[in-house]
Amino acid sequence: MSRLKELRKKRGYTQVKMQMLTGIDQSDYSKIENGKRYYTFEQCRKIAIALDTSMDYFAGLTDEDKPYPRVEK
């Protein structure tokens, strides 16, 4: 199972819910999730925000599915 699908299910979201949260058509989202279509940088960003994770998690650069903490200046 892809990280994207795994995390979506962990959050209890359907593909229709992801469409509502990201604005990505459900058909396109399904293709992205199943590896039949690549996502754009902007789509990846929207998905990461919707699933409360980092884009690095989807890229396999980290195994931590939580977003990075923001640094206060």
Residue ranges: model-predicted function:
Residues 8, 19, 48:
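The alpha-helix within a helix-turn-helix
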Residues 12-34:
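Short alpha-helical DNA-recognition segment
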Residues 4, 15, 26, 41-44:
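Helix-turn-helix DNA-binding elements, focusing on the entry/boundary residues of the two helices
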Residues 1-10:
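A short, Lys/Arg-rich alpha-helix, primarily the initiator
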Residues 23, 42-57:
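DNA major-groove recognition helix of helix-turn-helix/homeodomain DNA-binding modules
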Residues 33, 43, 59-62:
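DNA major-groove recognition helix of helix-turn-helix
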Residues 10, 49, 59-73:
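Short, charged recognition helix plus adjacent turn
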